[in-house]
Each structure stands twice: as C-alpha cells, then as structure tokens.
From Swiss-Prot:
It is found in: Cytoplasm. Belongs to the thymidylate synthase family. Bacterial-type ThyA subfamily. It catalyses: dUMP + (6R)-5,10-methylene-5,6,7,8-tetrahydrofolate = 7,8-dihydrofolate + dTMP. One of its GO terms (cellular component) is cytosol. GO terms for molecular function: thymidylate synthase activity. Pathway: Pyrimidine metabolism; dTTP biosynthesis. The lineage of its organism: Bacteria, Pseudomonadati, Pseudomonadota, Gammaproteobacteria, Enterobacterales. It comes from the Bacteria. Keywords: Cytoplasm, Methyltransferase, Nucleotide biosynthesis, Transferase. DUMP binds at residues 21, 126-127, 166-169, 177, 207-209. Catalyzes the reductive methylation of 2'-deoxyuridine-5'-monophosphate (dUMP) to 2'-deoxythymidine-5'-monophosphate (dTMP) while utilizing 5,10-methylenetetrahydrofolate (mTHF) as the methyl donor and reductant in the reaction, yielding dihydrofolate (DHF) as a by-product. This enzymatic reaction provides an intracellular de novo source of dTMP, an essential precursor for DNA biosynthesis. (6R)-5,10-methylene-5,6,7,8-tetrahydrofolate binds at residues 51, 169, 263. This is Thymidylate synthase. One of its GO terms (biological process) is dTTP biosynthetic process. It comes from Photorhabdus laumondii subsp. laumondii (strain DSM 15139 / CIP 105565 / TT01).
Length: 264
C-alpha cells in the first residue's frame, strides 16, 4: 500500500489549506488516481490496523439496500452513528440508490442487479455503471455520497472497477473505501465467473483534516507490510446472499491502530 502513503505525502507537500463543511479545516489537493492489481493481494492498509468487521458489514448493509443503522449496531459497527437521526435513519443514502433508485414515473431501478445482468450478457458494454449521486434526493440524505460513481470493465476474463470519489478523508475514510470496493469486485467477479483485475481509485477533493496531521506523520514513519489475502469460503446463489462469515482475511499483519477524530 505504498501508493496510499505516497498520496498522504503528496497532500502534505502540495495541499492547499481550505475551509470545509465541518469547520475543521483541511489540506486539500484536487485529482489523484491509484491503481491496485487485485491479483497481488487484498488492498488493506498495513501501516495501521483497519477494522475489517466494519468494512465487511457496511458493504453487506449497502448491498441489502438498508439505510438504517440498526443492522450495523446489531453487528458492532458504529461508523455511521454521527449522521443518523433519533430513529437510526440516514435518508436515501448508498443502499437506497444502489438498490432502489427512484425514477420520475414512480419506478425503482436496482442498479446492482442491472450491472450483474450486463456483466453476464454484454461484458464489453461501456455503460456498466452504478451511481449514488441522485441530485433529486441529495437534500434528503444525512450525508451526500462521497464515493459517488463506479464503473465495471471486463478484459481477458478479468473484472476491473473504477471508483470516482468526489470527497476523500485520506486518513480515516480512504482505507475503508479502498477495501470495500476491492471486496465488492471480488464478490462481483465470483458471481460472474470472472477473475479479479484492477481496482482504480480516482479522487476529487482529496484531503487531510487539520486534526489528523500528527496521526498522518506517525503512519508515514511506518514501513508497509505484505498485503493480506481475501478468501471467499463459498459462492452464494446471488450477490445479495453473502454473509459476514463467508469472508476471511488471511495473513493480515498490520502496525497498531491510530485513533483520530471524525469530522462531522
């Protein structure tokens, strides 16, 4: 994961001080890309420990179309707590947009089922895309989508994915985002009888919060370790039938965790 540390170094060296919605302040760059060959290992940051349980359960929650934090709480995941209302609701965030995008004529589009069908029937299509950026519902969301738009690409029997992330918290959020989408690519590839290819991450406003600087420097002082491997223990009937226990991350040997405040 040297690419991730290189991004941190770039933000520290080139970042512009900016105000932000949370009032915390950031160092920010605009436009950055990283490419991870998923054949080389699972791209989970090793210079600090990442909470794998949260990454997996959050993705399963998205895939279920859920937008209430009850499932997350039942599974010991608290990463969405700061944005939920008193009933645990978040409004029409990722799960709603991925699984039930509302149309003007009252229909709902399951974008994930659609892309699965496309990958199987027309893998050369240039329209295999999922968007969470529903302009008509942004004002109803507790938090506008940060990882907003992703596209799949098939070549030589391998499935690749590119994500556009409009806003990126490099220290806290990005390790989760990379691992989450890498996991999704593995799941989609298994369902479509493909090998995994590349995960390409593209960032818009890519920033370090001002209260993450010491943590960032600590992380940069650490040497990256070998990437772990992802094992998927079974092939469920569909993308939506995976369970937490279907996944195992093996040979993950990270440095200790580093705590940092969340900007809300």
């Amino acid at each position: 994961m040297k690419q991730y540390l290189d991004l941190m170094t770039r933000v520290l060296a080139e970042g512009t001080p900016k105000a932000d919605r949370t009032g915390t302040g950031t160092l920010s760059i605009f436009g950055h890309q990283m490419r991870f060959n998923l054949q080389d290992g699972f791209p989970l940051v090793t210079t600090k420990r990442c909470h794998i349980r949260s990454i997996i359960h959050e993705l399963l929650w998205f895939l279920n179309g859920d937008t209430n934090i009850k499932y997350l709480h039942e599974n010991g995941v608290t990463i969405w707590d700061e944005w939920a209302d008193e009933n645990g609701d978040l409004g029409p965030v990722y799960g709603k947009q991925w699984r039930a995008w509302g149309t003007a004529d009252g229909r709902q589009i399951d974008q994930l089922k659609t892309v699965l069908e496309q990958l199987k029937s027309d893998p050369d299509s240039r329209r295999i895309i999922v968007s969470a950026w529903n302009v008509g519902e942004l004002d109803k969301m507790a938090l506008a989508p940060c990882h907003a738009f992703f596209q799949f690409y098939v070549a030589d029997g391998k499935l690749s994915c590119q994500l556009y992330q409009r806003s990126c918290d490099v220290f806290l959020g990005l390790p989760f985002n990379i691992a989450s989408y890498a996991l999704l690519v593995h799941m989609m590839a298994q369902q479509c009888d493909l090998e995994v290819g590349d995960f390409v991450w593209t960032g818009g406003d890519t920033h370090l919060y001002s209260n993450h600087m010491e943590q960032t420097k600590l992380q940069l002082s650490r040497e990256p370790r070998s990437l772990p491997k992802l094992v998927i223990k079974r092939k469920p009937a569909s993308l939506f039938d995976y369970k937490f226990d279907d996944f195992e991350i093996v040979d993950y040997d990270p440095h200790p965790g580093i705590k940092a405040p969340v900007a809300i």
